[in-house]
Swiss-Prot record:
Known cofactor(s): Zn(2+)
Presence of keyword Transcription: no
Name of this chain's protein: UDP-3-O-acyl-N-acetylglucosamine deacetylase
E.C. numbers: 3.5.1.108
Enzyme class: hydrolase
Cysteine pairs bridged by disulfides in the record: none
Any one GO molecular function term: metal ion binding
Catalytic reaction list: a UDP-3-O-[(3R)-3-hydroxyacyl]-N-acetyl-alpha-D-glucosamine + H2O = a UDP-3-O-[(3R)-3-hydroxyacyl]-alpha-D-glucosamine + acetate
GO cellular component: membrane
InterPro entries xrefs: Ribosomal_Su5_D2-typ_SF (IPR020568), UDP-acyl_GlcNac_deAcase (IPR004463), UDP-acyl_GlcNac_deAcase_C (IPR011334), UDP-acyl_N-AcGlcN_deAcase_N (IPR015870)
One Gene Ontology term from the biological process aspect of the record: lipid A biosynthetic process
Keywords: Hydrolase, Lipid A biosynthesis, Lipid biosynthesis, Lipid metabolism, Metal-binding, Zinc
């Protein structure tokens, strides 16, 4: 059986910023936690008490354009970029107090959360955690979206992105073994993106109240609108891998598998994560 020591942060760290969808400011307070706590978000209720929202599939509330968790009256939106950084750095136990309903977007990538982990430092804890391994393939398909996971001794993600409506994105493919180093260098810097012709719809729906060129890349047929150039020629597919890592972290336990994805988004990622969890619990 694969196993490693559990991890938390060495000290508390804070970060304030604006949420990309709601457009409201929020402050994160990341606090070390004891072994076997898991990742737990906290929102302060009207009475002043903190409501716990474990970062688990059971608490996924919505998956439109981002992944939102909820428990009781507490809601935490857009958790995927933070969760991807925690998962890829093997952070198992953490209390995350959030003053608002949405995680700050930073620059649209996971860089700010990797930097927070570095500021706090990583604490190796006494207890071990088992790393689950699939014993059979797992599949999910909905229309032209496809996901599969195969037994492996490492976490590897192979993603195919197909955007026929955008000649500047087109078809992109990336396959990568996910570990702390590869995530930091190859995935964490990759920003969220949108198509130019989607922006009016998103604005009308109030879905990008905090979106700007400081935290997203906009793709047009004849180029991009961005602060600077793309960080990678295939930045969109890499960001899709980032989102997938964050969503699958809600399985709630570390696991290894070779994950294949074609055109998946938050809704399909979460549905697929539930199938993986079922397979691991057999």
């Amino acid at each position: 059986m694969l196993e490693r020591t559990q991890r938390t942060l060495k000290r508390e760290v804070r970060y304030s910023g604006v949420g990309i969808h709601l457009g409201k400011s929020s402050t994160l307070h990341l606090q070390p936690a004891q072994t076997n706590t898991g990742i737990v978000f906290q929102r302060q209720s009207a009475s002043g008490n903190y409501e716990n929202v474990p970062a688990l599939l059971d608490h996924v509330y919505t998956t439109g354009r981002s992944t939102t968790l909820s428990r009781g009256s507490a809601v935490i939106a857009t958790v995927e970029h933070l969760m991807a950084a925690l998962r890829s750095n093997n952070i198992d136990n953490l209390i995350i107090q959030c003053s608002g309903e949405e995680i700050p977007i930073g620059d649209g990538s996971s860089n700010v959360f990797v930097e927070l982990i570095d500021q706090a430092g990583i604490c190796e804890q006494e207890d071990k955690v088992s790393i689950a391994r699939l014993t059979r393939p797992v599949y999910y398909q909905h229309q032209d979206i496809f996901l599969a996971a195969f037994p492996s001794d490492e976490l590897k993600i192979s993603y195919t992105l197909h955007y026929p409506q955008s000649s500047t994105i087109g078809t992109q493919y990336k396959s990568l073994v996910i570990n702390e180093e590869s995530f930091r260098q190859e995935i964490a810097p990759c920003r969220t993106f949108a198509l130019y012709n989607e922006l009016c719809f998103l604005m009308e729906k109030g879905l990008i109240g905090g979106g700007c060129l400081d935290n997203a890349v906009v793709f047009k047929d004849d180029g991009i609108i961005s602060r600077g150039q793309l960080r990678f020629a295939d930045e969109p597919v890499r960001h899709k891998i980032l989102d997938l890592i964050g969503d699958l972290s809600l399985v709630g336990r570390p696991f290894v598998a070779h994950v294949l994805a074609v055109g998946s988004g938050h809704s399909s990622n979460i549905a697929f994560g539930k199938k993986i969890l079922e397979a691991l619990e057999l």
